[in-house]
From Swiss-Prot:
It comes from Mesorhizobium japonicum (strain LMG 29417 / CECT 9101 / MAFF 303099). PROSITE patterns: CLPX_ZB. GO terms for biological process: cell division; proteolysis involved in protein catabolic process. The gene is clpX. Component of the ClpX-ClpP complex. Forms a hexameric ring that, in the presence of ATP, binds to fourteen ClpP subunits assembled into a disk-like structure with a central cavity, resembling the structure of eukaryotic proteasomes. PANTHER family: ATP-DEPENDENT CLP PROTEASE ATP-BINDING SUBUNIT CLPX-LIKE, MITOCHONDRIAL, ATP-DEPENDENT CLP PROTEASE ATP-BINDING SUBUNIT CLPX-LIKE, MITOCHONDRIAL-RELATED. This is ATP-dependent Clp protease ATP-binding subunit ClpX. CDD domains: RecA-like_ClpX.
Length: 424
């Protein structure tokens, strides 16, 4: 039932949302039903919940294995661009669980596991792809940072901690954990530090690669129950990693130079045309990667062999960055518009302003990751001044504001009323 205030004559007829308790003055719209009321904010929340449930149920197909098309469709809702990488991930995840669904039915051919390596410049969506997969695939999922890993016995995390995190995400259900997905980020940071053997042991580089080999290929890892340190007296949980899918991702800074150098050597001679690395985008160069380039970068041959599926991601171009700014559910423009709504102010971006923001991100070579810092710099003064100003109803951001040659345009309530009267 809706609540009716009894404190004063003004509040006697005030209506309240039956779900969140907000009054009709705190929301834009209050919809009346038989003896109940619901506000526009609660309606939006209900619609979001229904949409999420529809997306989750959509990826359920025959035998419980989502088809590649179904996985791709959900990835497209959250991740802009990268069609090739999304297709590779969709097929790999589908095949992985199809293999598990048919395990033991026909033993004449044993299907090997295909772990995945994602290579792409910074800010192109590698981590977001993995996080989105976690949201749409109903299996335990964990993310690990390769920079924190060291060999067992040294200060830092050992590789078995990854399996422990996966087990925790499965609520210590070993059967479910053994069908999970592990994403290891910053995998390029564990490359061999140099070609020359050193007196000091490389515990965070080649040593970690060696330690990861076993769990990626398939081994029975001993994990302490409910976390904590290992003690000789305690019983361990045995987790078989043979059916855990490993996805590794990294920016591989400098790999483009290795690939370009190899291209130059193979293009020597009269009439050979070699494009300068400066004339080609990093994503285009990465597409020509070969296993030998990864070996030169510092990955050991056995480790490269454990990652047979290779997907390269492209640099995000201007249209893709504009889409990222405006289209996803949690798009940056929508986030800042919601912030300004809290001050009862509309925030408007001209199309050429969004284009200028995207161009600046491309110049900085930070990809989508750099968009937030650019937006913060543009709106800093406005967000500082706005709470103390009265009567502002709209803030307009033009291309000149992004380039720094003008200030944001403030439109006051009187001006808005005049505009409305003129158009009427």
């Amino acid at each position: 039932m809706s609540k009716v205030g009894n404190n004063s004559g003004d509040s006697k007829n005030t209506l309240y949302c039956s779900f969140c308790g907000k009054s009709q003055h705190e929301v834009r719209k209050l919809i009346a039903g038989p003896t109940v009321f619901i506000c526009d904010e609660c309606v939006e929340l209900c619609m979001d919940i229904i949409r999420e449930e529809n997306k989750t149920s959509m990826v359920k197909s025959r035998e419980g294995v989502p088809t590649p098309q179904e996985i791709l469709k959900v990835l497209d809702d959250y991740v802009i661009g990268q069609p090739y990488a999304k297709r590779v991930l969709s097929v790999a995840v589908h095949n992985h669980y199809k293999r598990l669904a048919h395990a033991g039915k026909n033993n004449d051919v044993e299907l090997a596991k295909s772990n995945i390596l994602l290579i792409g410049p910074t800010g192109c969506g590698k981590t977001l792809l993995a996080q989105t997969l976690a949201r749409i695939i109903d299996v335990p999922f964990t993310m690990a940072d390769a920079t924190t890993l060291t060999e067992a016995g040294y200060v830092g995390e050992d590789v078995e901690n990854i399996i422990l995190k996966l087990l925790q995400s499965a609520d210590y259900n070993v059967e479910r954990a053994q069908r999970g997905i592990v994403y290891i980020d910053e995998i390029d940071k564990i490359s061999r530090k140099s070609d020359n053997p050193s007196i000091t042991r490389d515990v965070s580089g080649e040593g970690v690669q060696q330690a990861l080999l076993k769990i990626m290929e398939g081994t029975v890892a001993s994990v302490p129950p409910q976390g904590g340190r290992k003690h000789p007296q305690q019983e361990f949980l045995q987790v078989d990693t043979a059916n855990i899918l490993f996805i590794c991702g990294g920016a591989f800074a400098g790999l483009d130079k290795i690939i370009s150098d190899r291209g130059r050597k193979t293009s020597i001679g009269f009439g050979a045309t070699v494009a300068s690395p400066e004339d080609r985008r990093t994503g285009d160069i990465f597409r020509q990667v070969e296993p030998e380039d990864l070996l030169k970068f510092g990955l050991i041959p056995e480790f490269v062999g454990r990652l047979p599926v290779l997907a390269t991601l492209e640099d995000l171009d201007e249209p893709a960055l504009i889409q990222i700014l405006t289209e996803p559910k949690n798009a940056l423009v929508k986030q800042y518009q919601r912030l300004f709504e809290m001050e009862n102010v509309d925030l408007t971006f001209h199309e050429n302003a969004l284009s200028a923001i995207a161009k600046r991100a491309i110049e900085r070579k930070t990809g989508a990751r750099g968009l937030r810092s650019i937006m913060e710099a543009i709106l800093l003064d406005t967000m500082f001044e706005l709470p103390a100003l009265e009567g502002v109803r709209e803030v307009v951001i033009s291309e000149e504001v992004v380039t720094g040659s003008a200030r944001p345009l403030y439109i006051y309530s009187e001006q808005k009323e005049k505009k409305g009267n003129v158009s009427a």
